[in-house]
Amino acid sequence: MSPTLVVDQENSEEFNTSSFEGPEKLLELWFSAPIKTNLSAGEKANLGLKAVSRNDWDDMLAQAQCKVLSVVNSEEIDAYLLSESSMFVFAHKIILKTCGTTTLLASLPRLLEIASSVGFDRPLRIFYSRKNFLYPERQLAPHTSWEEEVRYLQLFFPSGCSYVVGPTNKNHWHLFSDLADDYSLLEDSLDPEDETLEVLMTDMSPERSLQFYAPSLDVVRSARGDDYVREKNNLSGGHILGSYVADESGVRDLCSTSDKKAVLDAFQFEPIGFSSNMIYKDRYATIHVTPQEHCSYASFETNVSQFQFGRSISETIEKTVKTFGANKFCLTLFQAKGASQEKHFSAKLKSFSSYKREEFIVYDFPGYDLIFASFTAV
């Protein structure tokens, strides 16, 4: 089945401003081992979370104070582009990422209720993470401090552990993680090639930031012709501009797989700000940009493999920071443990030209290793 795009015209037209707090809150819940949904004829697929109705997801997202702009669907993933960032729904897990002053954790009770309705009693693995906020004083409960977030999470996951990674007076990263007692059911099925990279960038160059200020449709017509706009008449204005900006800024190239079969869903906010989701088989990438000079921020997250991209992790990182002109960035890399897989952390995250590495930290978690590193332009 080919991926399909569904645009929510009403919400796409309603949300035309960007949040000033770029750094996202990120929640990832695993409810089971990966479920095969692309079964042959005659076999019945277990759709798990993918069986949840749009109304239920809308209800949950309302608790987080965000709405759906559009959805790209495939057999493996439903990728929701939101008014504030993104949501990815697999049969067995969900990833919810929201920026600004959204109240992501306030949606957790409803999320667990929805998961229970499709047969998942509790998550086997929980991740909640975020970079340090630019404007922490603007956040709403339960996000007014990391301590408050941890207290709230422990109401649901009392055995969870809290980590602060990196120097607290510079760029740093928060993580809350928990495992169910029967986590081994999941660990035995982990893909040894599973890697999730997140690059969190600040202090973008003015030249690159300007690429994410909304052009007019007249500018797009002048640059690409009337046919370019006419072909996209089923899209909202934000999606038409998003497609154009993705081409012009290098975002589409950054998200392209080696076989050119990835599907990109992009939205340009007016007057400023950009978001996109990409899906490829059972993999995804997501980008969010807040380009204002005084609080510029861009993020890139993906679990697309090096083989699928046709480039190394280091090459992907270099391409990412060049695309957004970041003067500072930190990154996290979650990598599944594999008996036959050699780990060469320093080789994967080599020194990057024009950047000085300030921090390099490795954590050993059950089933995964985590790398955190931060860099500043020189």
Curated annotation (Swiss-Prot):
Pathway: Amine and polyamine biosynthesis; S-adenosylmethioninamine biosynthesis; S-adenosylmethioninamine from S-adenosyl-L-methionine: step 1/1. Binds 1 pyruvoyl group covalently per subunit. The record marks 84-85 as: Cleavage (non-hydrolytic). One of its GO terms (biological process) is spermine biosynthetic process. One of its GO terms (molecular function) is adenosylmethionine decarboxylase activity. GO terms for cellular component: cytosol; nucleus. Coiled coil: none annotated. InterPro entries: AdoMetDC-like, S-AdoMet_decarboxylase_euk, S-AdoMet_deCO2ase_core, S-AdoMet_deCO2ase_CS. The modification Pyruvic acid (Ser) is found at residue 85. Belongs to the eukaryotic AdoMetDC family. This is S-adenosylmethionine decarboxylase proenzyme. The gene is spe2.
